[in-house]
Every structure is written in structure tokens, then in C-alpha cells.
Amino acid sequence: DIELKLSTRPEKRVGSDELWDRAESALASALDSAGQPYDLQPGEGAFYGPKIEFSLKDCLGRVWQCGTLQLDFNLPIRLSAEYVSEDNSRKNPVMLHRAILGSFERFIGILIEHYEGAFPAWLAPTQAVIMNITDKQADFALEVEKTLAESGFRAKSDLRNEKIGFKIREHTLLKVPYLLVIGDREVEMQTVAVRTREGADLGSMPVAQFAEFLAQAVSRRGRQDTE
């Protein structure tokens, strides 16, 4: 959920009321033209201009301010910033202060809480993990990792001398979207057995087919990519 808020002139500010009227009117008109509902926040603007705030709700229903768009008629004048207009006269430009994410750390925190660590494939730090059952499959597991990496995916191998059930459980708890298991049959057939972190068994498929599947999951940009 995204909430939009229009923050207007604070008590302590720079610039004339005329400039503030123009700036506030411009932002309100932009919101109205876009058909976006918004709340008015009197007195919450920056000292140099009004702003539109984009606030996000996390999984607990808390509201966090993230992106902002501020319209500033004042600082260009104070900085003596000018441009030559079509009639060859010098005019002061209008400055837009745009923060797409706001605080980067806060935005990452919201994403982590929203997805509860189970990032969709396009966002997951590790998109797929390749696990061998015995040492005999280690070389093929590394080949699969290299193939996926060369295709632009974030994949890694887990070649530890642990039971496959232990590896699957561990990477499921780490919420890696796709778990690839390689045994003797997979080496013989040059395939991978694909599971999701939710426990769904997608069966065996050639590495190229899985790469296509993962590419489609990434392109969807959402949780449904593991369904």
C-alpha cells in the first residue's frame, strides 16, 4: 500500500508567500491530474518548498515515509541560478528535489519485513542453490553453477559432505527460492531436480530449461514466481 501526502509551508521558511502559493498549487495540480488521492499535511514541508511524500505500509501495518518530491522555487534564486529563455531574458529555474527510495537502509528494511525474508526470485540475493548428494556429483554441480552464473543468475553450490535432507532444510530456512538437487541420475541425464522453498517438487529438467524457467520467474517481479 502506498499513501501520498502533500506537505505545505512550515512556519519557519524562506521565500515569499507568492512563491509558496505557486509551488503548493503546482504539486496539488499534479496529484489531481494523476487522479491520486492524498492527505494534506499543513506545515510539514521543507523550509525551502512543499513536497509530496510517498509512504509505504509494512507487513505490520506501520507507515514509513520513503520517496519524496519537493518543488523548490527558492534555492535557485538564492544560488543565483539562471537560464536564458526563448525571449533571451534571464530567468530562475525551478528545482525538483527527488528521492526515489528515501533512506536506502529504511527501504531495504521495509522490503525484508514485507517479504519476511522470502524475497521473490528477482530480488533474492541467491536465486538458486545447487546441492550434490555425494562427492561423485560435485563436478557437475559446479558446471551447473557456472552455466547459471554465465546466464546472469545468482547461483551457488553447496558441496559439503552433509546429508541431502540437511542441505535442503538449511537452504529452505535461508529462503532461497529454488533448490537444485543433483544425484547420479541427474548427472547421467544432464538434468537438475528442482524444488521450491515452499516444498513444491517441480521435477527434473535440463539446465537450459531451468534457466528459462528462472528467467520467467525473475521477469514476473512478484511472489507468484515460486508457485
UniProtKB/Swiss-Prot annotation:
List the residue ranges of the region (Catalytic): 1-120
Top class in the EC scheme: ligase
Signal peptide interval: none
| Function, in words | Catalyzes the attachment of threonine to tRNA(Thr) in a two-step reaction: L-threonine is first activated by ATP to form Thr-AMP and then transferred to the acceptor end of tRNA(Thr). Also edits incorrectly charged L-seryl-tRNA(Thr).
Q: What family name appears in the similarity comment?
A: Belongs to the class-II aminoacyl-tRNA synthetase family.
Outline the subunit composition. Homodimer.
- Name used for this protein in its record: Threonine--tRNA ligase
- Name the source organism: Pseudomonas syringae pv. syringae
